[in-house]
Amino acid sequence: MLAPKKQKFRKAHKGRVASKAKAGTTLAFGSFGLKSIDGWRVTARQIEAGRKAATRCMKRQGRLWIRIFPDVPVSKKPAEVRMGKGKGSPEFFAVRVSPGRIMFEIEGVEENVALRALELASAKLPVRTRIVRRYE
C-alpha cells in the first residue's frame, strides 16, 4: 500500500476538503482518466483496491497511472475507550481529494477496456467520479 517514507509530523488535523482542485485537473499521461466530482478523503486501501480492479480488467496490458498519493496520517482511538486522554495513534494514511482532481489515468488499451477498468476502479472509491477522455 502507498505510504510516505518520511513525515514532518506524526499526527495531522482532521481538515476539510473545501474548494475545487487547482492542480491535477487535466490528463497528463494517459488517454482516459477518472475525475472526482465530490471532495472526500480517500484511503490508501481504497486506492490500492481501485488499482487492483483496474489492472485485473486490463489483463496487465497498457499502463495505469495513480495521480493521488496518501500523505495525511489518520489517527483513531481503540475500541471501548472513554473520551479524552489525548488523540489516538495514527492508523492509516489518506489523501484529501478535491472536486475536479484526476485520480487514475489509463493508456495503451482499447477504449471499451479502458472505460470498463475505470468503472471498476470508481466502484472502489468513496467519491463520485466521471470518466474523461483526452480529446473531449
From Swiss-Prot:
InterPro entries: Ribosomal_uL16 (IPR047873), Ribosomal_uL16_bact-type (IPR000114), Ribosomal_uL16_CS (IPR020798), Ribosomal_uL16_dom (IPR016180), Ribosomal_uL16_sf (IPR036920). GO terms for biological process: translation. GO terms for cellular component: cytosolic large ribosomal subunit. The keyword Ribosomal protein applies. GO terms for molecular function: rRNA binding; structural constituent of ribosome; tRNA binding. Transmembrane segments: none annotated. Keywords: Ribonucleoprotein, Ribosomal protein, RNA-binding, rRNA-binding, tRNA-binding. Disulfide bonds: none annotated. Part of the 50S ribosomal subunit. Binds 23S rRNA and is also seen to make contacts with the A and possibly P site tRNAs. Belongs to the universal ribosomal protein uL16 family. PANTHER family: 50S/60S RIBOSOMAL PROTEIN L16, LARGE RIBOSOMAL SUBUNIT PROTEIN UL16M. This is Large ribosomal subunit protein uL16. It comes from Rickettsia felis (strain ATCC VR-1525 / URRWXCal2) (Rickettsia azadi). The lineage of its organism: Bacteria, Pseudomonadati, Pseudomonadota, Alphaproteobacteria, Rickettsiales. The gene is rplP.
